[in-house]
Every structure is written in C-alpha cells, then in structure tokens.
Amino acid sequence: MSNLRTLVFYATPEHPCSYLDDRLATTMFVDPKADINLDLYTRLSQLGFRRSGNHYYKPRCNGCNACIAVRIPTEEFNRTRSQERTWKRNSDLTVRLRSAQFEQEHFALYQRYISARHQDGDMYPPTLDQYESFLLEARSETLFIEFRKDSKLLAIAVTDRTTDGLSAIYTFFDPNEDKRALGVYAILWQLQFAREQRLPYLYLGYWIRGCRKMSYKTNYRPIQVLVRDSWITI
C-alpha cells in the first residue's frame, strides 16, 4: 500500500493554461499506478491536490502561483443574505445520494450542461468516454448527489468523501434553471451535509485571481487558502 513518502510524482510538459490567457502551465501528478487509500487521499487534499478520474494532480507552474487551493470550514461557515435566498428558493427540491455508476439520465444532463455552458472549453463536445473517465473511474468514496423537482432531475453534484471533509469534484445542472442558482445551492447543500456528518471541511479546488470562472469560490466565508503548505483563514 502506498504512503506519502513512497509516492512517485510526474510532471507534464508545459501546456497552455486553461484559466489564464497567455500563460503556460505545468501539472504535477501522482503515479497512476499508486494505491491511493482514503487516508492518503485526505493527506493529498490537505496538500492541495485534486482528483480527476484516476489522476491526482496539482499545478506546479514555472513563475506562477495563481492557482490557490481553498477549503471552507463547515462549522464556521455562515450563509450570506443572497445565499440564504438561494437556499430557501430551492427548498422544494428533493435530494438523493447515489453511488458513482453510469446512469443515462445523468449523462444526458451532463451533455446539455457542457453544450450550453462550456462550448469554449476542452470538455466540449461532451463524449461518453470523457464523462466516464472524468467522473466514474474513481477509486475513492464518490457520491453523485441528485437534486430533483418532483421526478425531474435538475442537478448533479459529484463529491468525494475523505476523512476530514468532502471534496467537491464537479457540478452540472439544467441550463434552463438559471434563476435557481443551482451551482450555488449545490455548494450550500454540501456544506450543510458535511456539517451534519461532522466533517470539518469542504474542499473547493483552486481559486484563481482574475479568472471569472473561479472567482465565485471566495463568496463563501470564512474560507481557507493554502499558502506555503499552511492553511490560512481569510
């Protein structure tokens, strides 16, 4: 069984940054053959690593530290007035926890979401292979959180459970339901669920100053940022 001291890491060649124009990025990732158990996954999350499919990675770019890992302490979190309105607006939804397995209904919603929201990104056009490798080929304790209005599926939040929290992997939702702010609601729900489960943190990935797609993460306060391997509350 692998441990942090025996892990082997690799680095990708420089490639165009997905978040900041005119920047080159390098990604450090764990050897895909490594046996990542729950404790090791937790430690990697604490060090700022993220999971995508079977890959655990962290930005390691020359001359750039723009990607800052963030997490929310669940016991200290308080909703803003806007977030409270979003919470109440979606009180008519039912929530169900599912395991990570293929469902045609889930994939159809994913296709609609990517096609409507991310035509300018490398996830478009959405394919079955991409969907499965991204969200289903996990060796972790992964949950698919379904949000429904009556029988209609409106959103899916994919999240991993670690020993110290939840790690929000991806959320996709009905692009015709903008007024519900389902992306916000999914984060609020995970925060509430983690608190009820006595899990101290919700990991949200990377906050990137100057990147509109990532700026929303600092709307959840208090928030902790990883700076020089130490978590600091801002």
UniProtKB/Swiss-Prot annotation:
Superkingdom of the source species: Bacteria
Q: What is its main location?
A: cytoplasm
Any one of the GO BP annotations: ubiquitin-dependent protein catabolic process via the N-end rule pathway
Keywords, alphabetical: Acyltransferase, Cytoplasm, Transferase
Q: Where in the cell is it found?
A: Cytoplasm
Q: List the catalytic activities from the record.
A: N-terminal L-glutamyl-[protein] + L-leucyl-tRNA(Leu) = N-terminal L-leucyl-L-glutamyl-[protein] + tRNA(Leu) + H(+); N-terminal L-aspartyl-[protein] + L-leucyl-tRNA(Leu) = N-terminal L-leucyl-L-aspartyl-[protein] + tRNA(Leu) + H(+)
One Gene Ontology term of the molecular function aspect: arginyl-tRNA--protein transferase activity
Q: Name a Pfam family for this protein.
A: ATE_C
Keyword Thylakoid found: no
Q: What is its EC number?
A: 2.3.2.29
InterPro entries the record matches: Acyl_CoA_acyltransferase, Asp_Glu_LeuTrfase, N-end_Aminoacyl_Trfase, N-end_Aminoacyl_Trfase_C, N-end_Aminoacyl_Trfase_N
Going by the record, the broad EC class of this enzyme is: transferase
Which Gene Ontology CC terms are recorded?
cytoplasm
User: Family assignment?
Assistant: Belongs to the R-transferase family. Bpt subfamily.
Function in brief: Functions in the N-end rule pathway of protein degradation where it conjugates Leu from its aminoacyl-tRNA to the N-termini of proteins containing an N-terminal aspartate or glutamate.
State what protein this is by name.
Aspartate/glutamate leucyltransferase
Q: Which organism is it from?
A: Hahella chejuensis (strain KCTC 2396)
The gene designation is: bpt
